[in-house]
Curated annotation (Swiss-Prot):
Purpose of the protein: Key negative regulator of Shh signaling during neural tube development. Recruited to primary cilia and acts as a regulator of the PKA-dependent basal repression machinery in Shh signaling by increasing cAMP levels, leading to promote the PKA-dependent processing of gli3 into gli3r and repress the Shh signaling. In presence of shh, it is removed from primary cilia, preventing its activity and allowing activation of the Shh signaling. Required in left/right patterning by modulating Ca(2+) levels in the cells surrounding the Kupffer vesicle.
Gene: gpr161
Species whose genome carries this gene: Danio rerio (Zebrafish)
Source lineage: Eukaryota, Metazoa, Chordata, Craniata, Vertebrata
UniProt membrane topology term: Multi-pass membrane protein
Stretches the record annotates as Disordered: 231-250, 505-526
Disulfide pairings: 96-174
Family that this chain belongs to: Belongs to the G-protein coupled receptor 1 family.
Protein name (database record): G-protein coupled receptor 161
Compartmental location: Cell projection, Cilium membrane; Cell membrane
InterPro entries the record matches: GPCR_Rhodpsn, GPCR_Rhodpsn_7TM
Length: 526
């Protein structure tokens, strides 16, 4: 008898040690989640707030998402940490109801916002011509307000008797008593979970299908040279044929890489949603159907832990994955080393980026946008990427979704500079690649910066001309006031000489340098 009692005591002590170790592990994990969620969402909110040009309609949804997650990490997760240590609620009934309502509200709004982001990108890809008119900044704000009201409708019933809030020691927090009202559980799952899930599956599925189609024509952000042009340039030359064959192989590899990266990005978005919220929905549905004790405590703890990790994943996927947001964040954090490397160009063109992004959001074609910002000089047919997460391609009727750049920056510069192909880059990327030692470029950039105010008066006419070009094939002269940037200040003499020399060549007249200088002097006197 004494031996059996001693064995039982040893087993109980061992179980106690295991339970204590598990409690410590759970507490440490939730502390790490709380810190990462707070920091991650805070940096995205601050970056978007301090850089207003980043608040495009698409990024307004990201701002709402990260703001709600930041609110959750500050007002709720610290109490979850305390409850995970004590295995009890110590903050009263009122605060229990408040944290339960806050958790349910933020969770519902986050899932619905993810569905809204999917719909926004769906319209950006499939309907690029009407996207800027349909998805405006004001409508994005209205959609966000509706999302919060929609979530509030789904979260208030427990306060009025349809189910209730209670502390669940295995979920570490106060939450809905899912097992008490099957009808409310079914209502909340349908109202706040299934709707965004269906929207994401449909929208991202169509986006990936369009990306596969566009990957056959667009690679590395460049317009693919047509087969006729390639054959005309290779008139029976053996070396040229060999080069063309190798180039075609590289294109095929790039196409496969583009599709793979698009698939990986969509897989990450959907996979994160299903991994963080899927198990939680399954567990609460099981509790509602089979009772409270139908799910083991370890599973309850695990699904709660996964649901909290969504607050860490959202700023990473929808914030830091964005190249522009990431660059601005690095510029804010490492001001001395990162931001001052090209301080003059970045400082003088910060407003240029803001204006150019707004012009791109108006839905104008890339060549017109480039002409507006470049002072009337066409940058060539190609593509232009806006902050809405998609790229305009003039050779295509639809746009390719850029959830993330299909190729890395290194491969972009390597492939897009070969054979003088016209690359598809943003205006910020164009400025980043300008040689820092060229004073003329800085001067021209400053001229553009000073003359941007004159664009507003003629912008409507420019949009009208662009619409005629796109829809009717007509081209009318763009107002000259748009191009006054070239005449505001005198550009360097050698640039004027190059311009005059090119004009004379086009007219069939060859002039020497002395004639060019004399003509330039006459223009200055006039």
């Amino acid at each position: 008898m004494n031996g059996s009692k001693n064995g039982t005591a040893v087993a109980n002590s061992t179980n106690g040690l295991d339970d204590n170790g598990l409690m410590v592990l759970e507490s440490v994990s939730i502390i790490i989640i709380a810190i990462l969620a707070c920091l991650g969402n805070l940096v995205i909110v601050v970056t978007l707030y301090k850089k207003p040009y980043l608040l495009t309609p698409s990024n307004k949804f990201v701002f709402s998402l990260t703001s709600s997650n930041l609110l959750l990490s500050v007002l709720m997760l610290p109490f979850v940490v305390a409850s995970s240590v004590r295995r009890d609620w110590m903050f009263g009934v009122v605060w229990c109801n408040f944290t339960a309502l806050l958790h349910l509200l933020v969770s519902s709004s986050s899932m619905l916002t993810l569905g809204a982001i999917a719909i926004d990108r769906y319209y950006a890809v499939l309907y690029p011509m009407i996207y800027p008119m349909k998805i405006t900044g004001n409508r994005a704000v209205l959609a966000i307000v509706y999302i919060w009201l929609h979530s509030l409708v789904g979260c208030l019933p427990p306060l009025f008797g349809w189910s209730s809030f209670e502390f669940d020691r295995f979920k570490w927090t106060c939450t809905v008593s899912w097992h008490k009202e099957i009808s409310y559980t079914a209502f909340w799952v349908t109202w706040c979970c299934l709707l965004p899930l269906v929207a994401m599956l449909v929208c991202y599925g169509v986006i990936f299908r369009v990306a596969r189609i566009k990957a056959r024509k667009v690679y590395c952000g460049s317009v693919v040279v047509s087969q006729e042009e390639s054959s005309s340039q290779n008139n029976g030359r053996k070396n040229s044929n060999t080069s063309t064959s190798s180039s075609g192989s590289r294109k095929s590899l790039i196409y496969s890489g583009s599709q793979c990266k698009a698939f990986i990005t969509i897989l990450v978005v959907l996979g994160t949603f299903l991994t963080t919220w899927g198990p939680y929905v399954v567990v609460i549905s099981t509790e509602a159907l089979l009772g409270k004790n139908s799910v083991s405590p370890q599973v309850e703890t695990l699904v709660s832990w996964l649901s909290f990790t969504s607050a860490v994943c959202h700023p990473l996927i929808y914030g830091l994955w964005n190249k522009t947001v990431r660059k601005e964040l690095l510029g804010m954090c490492f001001d001395d080393r990162y931001y001052r490397e090209s301080f003059v160009i970045r400082h003088r063109t910060s407003r240029l980026f803001s204006i150019s992004n707004r012009i791109t959001d108006l839905g104008m074609s890339p060549h017109l946008t480039a002409m507006l910002v470049g002072g009337g000089q066409l940058l060539g047919r190609g593509s232009s990427t806006g902050d809405t997460g998609f790229s305009y391609t003039q050779d295509s009727a639809t746009d390719v979704m850029l959830l993330e750049s299909y190729t890395s920056e290194a491969s972009h510069s390597a492939h897009c500079t070969a054979n003088k192909r016209r690359s598809s880059v943003t205006f910020e990327d164009q400025v980043d690649h300008i040689p820092q030692g060229d004073p003329s470029v800085v001067q021209v950039t400053a001229d553009i910066h000073k003359s941007l105010d004159s664009f507003a008066s003629s912008l409507a006419k420019a949009i009208e001309n662009d619409a005629k070009l796109q829809l009717l094939g007509e081209w009318t002269q763009i107002p000259t006031s748009l191009f006054t940037v070239r005449n505001t200040q005198r550009v360097p003499r050698y640039l004027d000489g190059q311009r005059l020399r090119m004009e004379s060549i086009d007219e069939g007249i060859v002039k020497d340098d002395d004639d060019d200088e004399e003509e330039m002097e006459r223009e200055e006197k006039m």
